[in-house]
């Protein structure tokens, strides 16, 4: 599962990992994926200018299953996926060169406060940070308070493109919380 963040889940799986102690059990996500994720530029895909494509073959299934592999365990040399959270996802190709954005809704078994969620995000670190690897972002996840963030134009290169930007964290009427995550798909991937 080492390449799991290389895909479309990199804008939300690390966020959910930071919140694991609150036991997220149901997730709805829509990803808005840059054309570079398809190996394209606007020069060789001009029909994407001013357009969206509401289907990316195979991405939705990966978006729902790969986080469970990431959070699973190894038994007898085989990855056994986690059983929770249940994830449903739609993946949309958007006219952006670099940067995958995700709009995510989450239900928790132990509903946290907004302050607890933000605290876990800004203090989250993993093995790359502990090992102080040269490409590891010093602060893996940043939280942006402004209502109009994260934005691809302003935030995709956070921590040299290796970090994740999160914003728009607010309570939801159907789920517990919702947020928007952004990551650089070609630098992180």
Name each model feature, range by range:
Residues 177-183:
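Short, well-ordered beta-strand elements
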């Amino acid at each position: 599962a080492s390449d799991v963040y290389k895909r479309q889940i990199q804008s939300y799986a690390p966020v959910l990992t930071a919140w694991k102690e609150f036991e997220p059990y149901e997730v709805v996500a829509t990803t808005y994926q840059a054309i570079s994720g398809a190996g394209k530029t606007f020069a060789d895909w001009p029909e994407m200018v001013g357009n969206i494509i509401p289907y990316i073959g195979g991405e939705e299934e990966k978006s729902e299953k790969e986080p469970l592999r990431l959070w699973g365990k190894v038994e007898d040399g085989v990855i056994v996926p986690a059983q929770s959270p249940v994830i449903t996802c739609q993946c949309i190709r958007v006219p952006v060169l670099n940067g995958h954005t995700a709009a995510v809704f989450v239900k928790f078994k132990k509903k946290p406060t907004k302050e607890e969620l933000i605290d876990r995000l800004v203090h989250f670190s993993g093995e790359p940070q502990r090992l102080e690897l040269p490409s590891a972002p010093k602060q893996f996840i940043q939280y942006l308070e402004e209502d109009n963030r994260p934005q691809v134009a302003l935030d995709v290169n956070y921590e040299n493109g290796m970090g994740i930007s999160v914003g728009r964290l607010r309570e939801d009427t159907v789920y517990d919380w919702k947020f928007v995550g952004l990551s650089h798909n070609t630098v992180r991937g």
